[in-house]
Amino acid sequence: MVKPSLFSANKLASAVVASLLFASAGAQADIATDVATTGWATQNGGTKGGSKAAANNIYTVKNAAELKAALKASVGTNGRIIKISGVIDVSEGNAYTKTADMKARGRLDIPGKTTIVGITNNAEIREGFFYAKENDVIIRNLTIENPWDPEPIWDANDGSAGNWNSEYDGLTIEGANNVWVDHVTFTDGRRTDDQNGTANGRPKQHHDGALDVKNGANYVTISYTAFKSHEKNNLIGSSDSRTTDDGKLKVTIHNSLFENISARAPRVRFGQVHLYNNYHVGSASHSVYPFSYAHGIGKSSKIFSEKNAFEISGISGCTKIAGDYGGSVYRDSGSTLNGTALTCTWSSSIGWTPPYSYTPLNADKVKADVTAKAGAGKIL
């Protein structure tokens, strides 16, 4: 047998390395140019974001200034792709002292036809918050640390004992059509609620929501996303008085993790909301984020809960999963609570069925799937 020369071996090694680099780059390009394939975001013409962006409308950003510039740049009709590398501190190390200051410096408005994707496993937004108010937006493979309002407001009429309330969610989808949130992690992160102390006899809450959908937003899918360590998580529909939301707020949340989430996972008004293959884990006696309820059944809500897995210590029965907030219908099919079938007595006449194709896992397969795949850094 003739042995290859050193030159030939080196050429072969170089070719292998080059092919691996090309494959890696190709895989990353696929992440940035993917379009929505599941849930409500596939309807109304689909959700494509900046998947067809021209090369000169693709930005890689590593700091707040670059991110803001990419969001504000004038681009062509095919939109933009913004690739986030590493941790971005939107405050640039200058702490917010007032709510107004946080609004002025921390707000990140996402234009229509935009894809935002983390390209490193540690891609993260801190000290900032996203607003999606324009159509056709995709956010993937990113950690968002829930914003911390420096000036919570006391409301003596909130509940029987009053409460502290704050502004700003990690992501607010407001009035926009066709939004896909995929493999994103939302967390209180470095500032958990036990660090905030109390005032007026109540915990001083510096967080608002993690991800809210409101004011007529429509055709939204949240997939393989992780929500961790948060109190009031997802609000779909902001007010009982917004009757114009009826027929809108079509949202799918699937194969997502809710870990130590106290409430609003999600709380719904008006919307046709499909919740399937989600894994909820927590405890009614958790020292910081005690479980209160998962699905809030609000005015004219039409929730279809399907094959979700709830592992919540200290609770039993559907009334602790589906909380009554003024709604009248709720359909669950095939979900489990602590390993046994969830049985609900709500009227299941929600009046709609999903118009898109999907193949849900059985509830006993959900935990393994979600823990392996949900959240930032886990796109296959």
UniProtKB/Swiss-Prot annotation:
Annotated Ca(2+) binding lies at: D169, D208, D212
| Catalytic reactions of this protein | Eliminative cleavage of (1->4)-alpha-D-galacturonan to give oligosaccharides with 4-deoxy-alpha-D-galact-4-enuronosyl groups at their non-reducing ends
Superkingdom is: Bacteria
Recorded GO cellular component terms are: extracellular region
Key words, A-Z = Calcium, Lyase, Metal-binding, Secreted, Signal
Which EC class does it fall in? lyase
So which cofactors does this thing need? Ca(2+)
Task: One Pfam family, please name it.
Answer: Pectate_lyase_4
Q: Where is this region: Disordered?
A: 189-209
Q: Where in the cell is it found?
A: Secreted
Recorded GO MF terms: metal ion binding; pectate lyase activity
Cofactor remark: Binds 1 Ca(2+) ion per subunit.
**A biological process term (GO) from this entry:** pectin catabolic process
Q: Where does the record place the catalytic residues?
A: R264
The answer, when asked if Lipid biosynthesis is one of the entry's keywords, is no
Xref: InterPro entries: Pec_lyase, Pectin_lyas_fold, Pectin_lyase_fold/virulence, PEL
List the signal peptide residues.
1-29
Q: Which PANTHER family does the entry link to?
A: PECTATE LYASE 18-RELATED, PECTATE LYASE 21-RELATED
> What job does this protein perform?
Plays a role in bacterial invasion of plants.
Q: Which family does it belong to?
A: Belongs to the polysaccharide lyase 1 family.
What name is this protein filed under? Pectate lyase
Q: Which organism is it from?
A: Pseudomonas viridiflava (Phytomonas viridiflava)
